[in-house]
Regions:
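Domain-scale signature associated with acetyltransferase and cell-envelope carbohydrate enzymes
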Residues: 1-113, 133-135, 152, 168, ...
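Beta-rich strand-turn-strand
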Residues: 93-95, 141-155, 160-164
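Flexible glycine-rich beta->alpha loop in the catalytic core of nucleotide-sugar glycosyltransferases
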Residues: 110, 117-118, 149, 160-161, ...
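Conserved catalytic-core motifs of eukaryotic protein kinase domains, centered on the activation segment
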Residues: 116-117, 122-124, 148, 182-183
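Glycine-rich NAD(P)-binding loop of Rossmann-like domains
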Residues: 122-135
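Conserved hydrophobic/aromatic beta-strand scaffold that supports enzyme active sites
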Residues: 161-163, 171, 179
Length: 215
């Protein structure tokens, strides 16, 4: 098809791509204007609610937003690493501190909070930092509650309610979430929001992970 295009048609297509890139860059700058630090090549689709003077996003940060996507650092610190993807309807609210590593993907309608907001009769208010390690994939409508530390390369199943720490290379599911499988990555690592497997910086070969059933 490209060979059938005239030089003028190719030029017009190139100009359209450049304009689209500029629009995306301006959109990201406007949507993320309140963050304290913004990385390179950020993309924001839709109109997310982004509020927080103590929020940092790394390079290649992507938000696929509807009107419900909310990122709030409030009185706390909210940190996103490089190549983080946030899907429609996800809500992340930091009152104390939430840290998200590199290559992390949030599916739609995920809810992450580091505070109960208020206590109830017989149970005091709880507030504790949340940490999500590199290479994690958080499934649709999963909830991550205050005080949870999720290790590296963890897959959180759809609808899971994570109430306690999760070790590296685990698949967790259920309410409350528990480890149902251990995942082994013998040679390569996965960038969660990509469809393909990509090699670790020090490894040339790539293999898919071996799934090991737990007793």
């Amino acid at each position: 098809v490209d060979e059938q295009l005239t030089p003028w048609q190719r030029k017009r297509i190139e100009l359209r791509w450049r304009r689209a890139f500029v629009r995306q860059e301006l959109k990201a700058r406007w949507s993320l204007r309140k963050v304290s630090k913004r990385g390179k090549r950020c993309i924001v689709l839709g109109s997310p609610v982004v509020d927080g003077s103590d929020m940092e996003v790394g390079d290649d940060f992507k938000v696929w937003s509807g009107h419900r996507t909310t990122l709030i650092s409030g009185w706390g610190r909210l940190r996103f690493g490089d190549r983080v993807f946030v899907n429609v309807g996800t809500t992340i609210i930091a009152v104390e501190q939430i840290v998200v590593g590199d290559d992390v993907a949030f599916a739609n309608d995920v809810f992450v909070m580091d505070s109960d907001s208020h206590g109830v009769e017989g149970r005091p208010h709880r507030q504790a930092p949340v940490s999500i390690g590199d290479g994690c994939w958080i499934g649709a409508r999963a909830m991550i509650l205050p005080g949870v530390t999720i290790g590296k390369r963890v897959l959180v199943a759809a609808g899971a309610v994570v109430t306690k720490d999760v070790p590296d290379d685990s698949l967790v599911a259920g309410n409350p979430a528990r480890v149902v499988r251990q995942l082994s990555y013998p040679v390569g690592c996965r960038r969660a929001w990509h469809d393909e497997w990509c090699p670790c910086p020090k490894v040339a070969a790539v293999q898919e992970p071996v799934v090991e059933e737990t007793a």
